Amino acid sequence: MTITDSVLSKANAKEIKSVVVMTERLKKLKREWEDADPVVYVDDTLLFTKSWKETDGLPVDLRWAKAFAKRLEECPILLRDDELIVGSLTKFTRGNNVLVAMKPREVLEMAKTGRFDRKLSDISATYIDPEDLKLLIEDAEYWVQHMPTVNYVNEALKEELGEGHFDLMFDRGMVFEGRAVRVDPDRGLFQGWGAFGGGIAQPTMPVIHNGLNHVINLAKAEIDKMVDQGACLPGASAAALRKYYLLKATIVSCEAIIAYAHRYADLARDLALKERNPVRKQELEKIAEVCDWVPGNRPRNYWEAVQSLRFLHLACWKESSERPEVGIGRIDQILYPFYEEDLAQGRLTRQEAGELLGAFWLKIRETENLVTIKREHRAAPGTLLPDVTLCGIDENGRDLTNELSWLVLEVMRQIKLSEPAVYIRWHEGMDEDFMLHALECNRDFGGGNPAFLNDKLGTDRYLARGVKPEDATNWLASGCLGYHLECGEHMAGMFSINQAKIFELTLYNGFDPRTKKQLGLQTGDVTQFTSLEQFYEAFFQQEDYFAEILRKHYFIWWSSENMNSPMSGLRAAMLYEDCIPAGLTSREGGARYPVCRASWIGDRGITDVADDLAAIEHLVFRSNKFTMAELLDAMAANWQGHDDIRQMCLNAPKYGNDDDFVDEIFNRVSLTTQMILTGRPDPFTGEKPMLFKGAAAGHVTQGASVGALPNGRKAGTPLNDAGTSAMPGMDVEGPTALINSATKAPHAWETVGITHNMKFPKAMLTSTAKLENLAALVKIFFARGGWHIQFNIHDSDELLKAKENPEQYKNVLVRVGGYSAYFVDLPPELQDEIIARTLHEVY
C-alpha cells in the first residue's frame, strides 16, 4: 500500500503532498535570510532601559509591562518585500536580539573584547555597527552599576554551605550543571531556569481563539470585582495590591501587543498606497486588514489565525527575550477549525494554506538572540527551542490527527530549517500511512524532525498526578524534550548532577584529579575493593551526598532569588487564564496545576557509569586482565602508553547491545540513582520531583570536566549523548538490540526529557518497504514502554565532508540532543561525537 492510495486519501493526503510550500516567494525570502549576515540589534534593550529609568518606584510587574509596551510602541518594524505573515523581532533581515539587563556583565565582556559569535563557529559570526557597539557598552555599564548586590545568591550559599561548595559548581568542578549553579553567573534582573513565572509559556489555544481583548476583559472584570469588594482601599493587604498590579500589568501588556499589530496594519496600508504591482498591492491591503483585527479578536479565517499565532509567539519573545523555550504548541489543533471552515467555504486552497504556513515557519526561524555565554558553558548552542506538537488523542480516545498534521510535516520537509522542532504524539490508533509520511519527511529532512513521543505515557504521567482527563490529554512538547500542560503548570528551576563525574570521584575516594581537591566523601580505596557490590555501595553513597547538597543549593538559590530578584511572571499570567482570577503568576501558584510536576533536578551520564562498572566487573574481577591499580594508572595517563588496557576497556561489554549483563547494571544504577534523586521532595511544594534528563549538548559540556573512564573514554571528551543512547560506535548488534536495551528499564522513562537517538543512512530508506520496517521499529519501541525516539538520517560521508568543507555544507542539519542544528555551527568535539554515532541499518 502506498501513502497516497491509503485510507487517508479521503483526507486529501495526495493533494497535501503535492502542495508546493517553497513557492518562488518563499524561496526568495529564505535565500535572503540565509545570505544575510547576523547583525546585533540594540533598539529593544535601549528602549527597555529607558523605560526602566522612567518608571523607578512603580511595582515591578507594572515596570516590566511598561518596558515591554515601550519596546512594542517605539521599536522599528520591518515588513519585507513579498511577506504575507509579518512581525519581526528586529529591524534586520537577520538580527540578533539582546536584552542587556538580563546579562550585563556577559554583554560588557563580549562588547569590550570584540568577541561576537552568534553560535559557535566562524561561519556564523555576528556583526555590530560601531555606533551601536558604543550604545551597547553604555547600556551594559549602566546595568552593571545598577544591579542589586550581584552575588547575593552566592553570599547565601556561602553562609549556608561554606566556601568549599563553589568547587562543585559548573564553572569549577562541574559536578553540578545549570546557569544557577555557577560561581560567577551573570546575574541580571532575572535569572535562571524557571524565571519569568516559573513556567514555560507559549500562545495557548484559548488566547488565540478568543483574542487578547478577551484577556483584557477578564483582567478588568477581576479588578472591578476587587474594587466592589473594597480590596483596593487604603490598608489593603499586600496580596490584594500584588494582584491588582499584576492585573494592571496584564492589561498594559495585552493592549501593547494589539497596538503593535496596528502599527503593522498602518505600515502595510502605507506601502499599499505606494505599490504599483496590483497583486502585491492587494496582498498589502489584506495584511493591513488582518493586523487590524488580530490578535485582539478571534480570528475570522485561517490567515488571521496564523498571523495571530505569529504575533503572540513574537510577543512572548519580546516580553522576556532571554528566556528560551517559547513553544508554538499544538499547531494542528490551534489552526484546524479556521482551516477546515475556510476550505469548506471555498475561501482557501490547500496550496494557499501551505504557503501561509511556510511564511509563518520562516518568521519563527528568523528569531535569534545574541549568544554571549562562553562556548564551554553552552548546553544548547544557539537554539531557542520553539517546539511544535502534532497529533495525540483526546480524553475520549479520539485520534486528533488531521489535514494540518500532514501539512505541517510537508512544510517542515520542504522549507528545511533547524527550527521549529516538530514532535508527533504517537499512539496505537495512529494511521499507518500518516506514520509513513512522517518517516518520509524525517528522511528528507535528515536532521531529526519530526521526533516521536509516546502519547499514552505522557498522558498517564499526568493522570497519575491527579490531572483531569481533558487536561491530561492536552499536553505538548517543550524545550529540550520536556513537556507540559497547555493549561499551565509550575516548573521550578533546573539543576543537573553529572553522574560520570560522581563516578570519577568514587574511583578516587572522593578526590577530584582535575581540581586537586577533596570534593566528595571518602568512600574507600577502590584498589582494595574485591567485588562490584563495593563499587555500587561507594557510588550510591556519593550520589546521596551530592543529591542532598544540590537540594540545599536549590532551596537557597530559589529562596534568595525570590527575595532579591524581581520576577514579573507576566507572560505566564497573560497566557494562562487561571492566573488572572488567582492574581498570581504560575511560579506563585496561579496555574491550574501549580504542583503537578516539580522537576527541579536532573542528571546525565548514567550509561557511562553502567559501561564503567561493566568494564571493571568483566576485566578486573571476572577475567583478571589487570588490577584496579593498573587501570587507574592507565586512566591517569589518559591511556598514553596503555593502549592495550584501553582497547580491552573499549571491547568490554557495552550498554546498547541487548546484553543482559551490562543492561542489568544500567537498570540498577539508573533505578537507584533515580530513587535517591526523587526521594527528596521539592522543598517548596512537597511534591516528589520528576527527574529531568534533557539532552541538549550537556554531554559535551559535562564531559569536559571528566577524566578518562573505565569504559575506554578519553579525558575531556563528550559523555554518551541523551539518556538511553549508547557510547558512540559501541552499539554494534543492530537497532533492535539497542531498543531492547533502552526499554529493559521501564523506570527510566518515568522521567522528563529523556532522549533516544539513532542514526540511519539515507540511502537505505528510499523504498516504502524500508520505511515500513522503520515504522515497525518505532512501534516496538513504544510498545515496550519507550518515551521518545528520534533519528539522524545521513549518509556516512556527508558529515565528514561538511566538517572538512563547512562553507559548502552550511545547510546540513543534524539532531544533537533535544534539538536540531546546522552541523557547521557546532563545536568540533560535538561534530565528532555525532559522526561517531553508530550508523544502523534497516532490513
Residue ranges and their predicted role:
Residues 262-265, 269, 365, 674:
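Structural signal for well-ordered, non-membrane alpha-helices
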Residues 2-247, 279, 283-286, 290-293, ...:
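Conserved catalytic cores of very large enzyme subunits
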Residues 251, 258, 265, 269-272, ...:
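Heptad-repeat amphipathic alpha-helical coiled-coil interaction surface used
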Residues 244, 248-260:
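Extended non-globular scaffold/tether segments
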